[in-house]
Amino acid sequence: MAFPINRGIVPTAKKVVIYGPEGIGKTTFAARFPNPVFIDTEGSTKEYDVARFPAPTSWQMLLDEVAEVKKNPQICRTLVIDTADWAEAACFAHVISAGQVKSIEDFGYGKGYVKAKEEFGKLLNELTEVVNAGVNVVVTAHAAMRKFEQPDEMGSYDRWEMKLYTSQKTNIAALLKEWADMVLFANYKTFAVKDKNSNKAKAQGGQRVMYTTHHPC
């Protein structure tokens, strides 16, 4: 049986993740995408003239709103989930409720976190279906400074990571990054300037920068 071989770029909708510290402009940037509809979980779009779904009050409601776009892709060209932090918290709450326990730790042996990762994966699968329907998907996330251990001459240092649960068994931040076609990090660009009088370095600047490749910041 012969299979046809295609060559060249295949135009498709994009899966984009934007993360950065609070107030950097993640929502503003997401609103620049073509004809966006927001699933605004934190009320971040109150001052924006954008289309939005009702704020989801549960994990299931979030999945239902995503499914609505999958069934009716003509309603927008970009679906924005703002933010992944809230989605993760709703996912954990759903797993706890479904398991009839009081805490994610009550499952024992890290099973609760594994269940949460599997459940979050369902959301990413649904979002992939939205992309396959021709709609861009943008997911925003807050960032937090964490210590990063590197087994080489660089040793350990602090760097910005998504403010999502991270462990050896369950790394939802890594899952989200692997899912995305494009991972963008927004931050303030600062530089150190020595004070002539005290000879101490002070941080100056504050220009907003979007990093599109890996950066130790």
Residue ranges and their predicted role:
Residues 42-46, 84-86, 143-148, 189-192, ...:
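Conserved nucleotide-binding/hydrolysis micro-motifs of P-loop NTPases
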Residues 2-93:
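Conserved P-loop
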Residues 36-38, 137, 183-185:
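Short, well-ordered beta-strand core segments
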Residues 86-174:
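P-loop NTPase motor core
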Residues 75, 133-134, 179:
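Structured helix-beta-strand junction loops
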Residues 149-217:
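Conserved GTP-binding G-domain of TRAFAC-class P-loop NTPases and closely related GTPase folds
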Residues 8, 28-30, 72, 129-130, ...:
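A general structural signal for short secondary-structure junctions and capping/turn motifs
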Residues 43-45, 61-65, 103-106, 163-165, ...:
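Glycine-rich loops and low-complexity Gly/Arg-rich segments
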